[in-house]
Amino acid sequence: LRDNMKELVNEAADGGVKFLVCASTPITTLDDVKASIEVLNKTDEACKKAGIGFAYHNHDAEFRAVEGQIPYEMFLSQTKMQMELDLAWATKGGKDPVELFKQHPGRFPLWHVKDLDKEMKNVLPVGEGIVEYKRIFDAASTSGMKHFFVEHDMPKDPWASITTSYGYLSKMLSA
């Protein structure tokens, strides 16, 4: 985005993309975070002008302090962009997704849905770990969720993982 943001936004808009998502940005120092916020704000404005949404996808690092500040909190307070909240990484980072929804209603139209083991070291199929999905999905309207994406980073058996996740979510959402 720093180098070719306008080109990316135009290509996304021309291709009919509804959301452009930034998957990561430098956050090693506070200066990195501030520079990232500037780029994210410019990208958000360009996306609005192009008629598409813009969101930021988190990992757990955004919830760790950088020089006394939490990058994710800075993103929420210093930008107007929307968020693609990775619910497992937020949980690993010590943030309660439902509390984020309450504090920033409507800012989370996109979710990444996966699960974590008790030690928060291994990704699991949805429903087999510690992420409180029933509670989180009950707060979907507060979050502004429009789409969610089930993922599992590097599963041993992708078909078994997605089948388990689908079964859990189907049962939970139909209850």
Residue ranges, per PLM feature:
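A short, acidic, flexible beta-alpha connecting loop/helix-capping segment that sits on the rim
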Residues: F149-P158
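Acidic/histidine-rich catalytic cores of soluble enzymes
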Residues: K49-I130
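Active-site acidic/histidine proton-transfer and metal-coordination neighborhood
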Residues: L1-M83, W159
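Conserved residues at the C-terminal ends of beta-strands
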Residues: A23, K114, E151
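H/E-rich (His + Asp/Glu) clusters that bind or coordinate divalent metals
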Residues: E128-F137, S143-V150
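Short acidic/polar active-site loop segments enriched in Thr and Asp
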Residues: V17-F19, P109, K146
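Short, acidic/polar
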Residues: L1-A12, G68, G93-K102, Y133-I136
